[in-house]
A protein has these predicted regions:
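Function-dense linear segments that define catalytic or interfacial modules
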Residues: 72-178
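Flexible, glycine/charged-enriched surface loops at secondary-structure junctions
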Residues: 1, 9-21, 151-166
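Conserved, charged catalytic cores of large soluble enzymes
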Residues: 4-99, 176-178
């Protein structure tokens, strides 16, 4: 259902949504959600990245079964996410409150997130005519936009945990694309 909703989040003809699903290693339906020719009957699943989430080192046989399933899917899904490692990385910086949080990740898995949190991601389009100076200016402006965007936390239709987490951390990402 969430993937179907994400299909309609389009601005200027460009999809503006990304999803991640972190499931148990034992969840066989999620393991095979993007196996075979899933795009024929369930094209909306293209909007989500699916990963198995484990909290402790799995048995080698279980891990290899998951790895084999990923290979056989021919879609690069389901990925493997180590929550214990994410918790250690979040703690390592010394800037984040770890107690009481189970960390996950954003759809591309480059940012460690609390449950019910997102990153304010700003994109800079790289053009063939850009110079180092023009790119630095774009990154500066994207940082300002993302910082402002992080203050917009009046989320009327979701739980208050989203507001609390996004205000406490105000995560910001700037990426180059194009």
């Amino acid at each position: 259902i969430v993937c179907k909703i994400a299909e309609i989040v389009v601005v200027g003809g460009v999809r503006r949504s990304a999803l991640i699903s972190l499931s148990n290693l034992s969840d066989d339906r999620m393991r095979h959600a993007k196996s075979g020719q899933w795009w024929n009957d369930n094209g909306q699943r293209a909007l989500a990245n699916n990963s198995a989430c484990y909290t402790e080192k799995p048995d080698m046989g279980i891990f290899m079964d998951e790895w084999k399933s990923l290979y056989e899917s021919k879609s690069g899904e389901r990925g493997i996410f180590n929550r214990a490692s994410a918790n250690k990385m979040a703690e390592k910086t010394g800037r984040r409150q770890i107690e009481g949080h189970e960390f996950g990740t954003n759809p591309c898995s480059e940012i460690i997130l609390r449950d019910r949190e997102f990153c304010n991601l700003s994109e800079c389009v790289v053009r063939p005519t850009d110079t180092r100076e023009t790119l630095m200016k774009k990154v500066e402006l994207a940082t300002i936009i993302g910082t402002f965007q992080s203050t917009l936390t009046n989320f009327k239709y979701v739980s208050s945990a989203w507001k609390r987490n996004c205000e406490e951390e105000r995560l910001l990402g700037v990426s180059l694309t194009g």
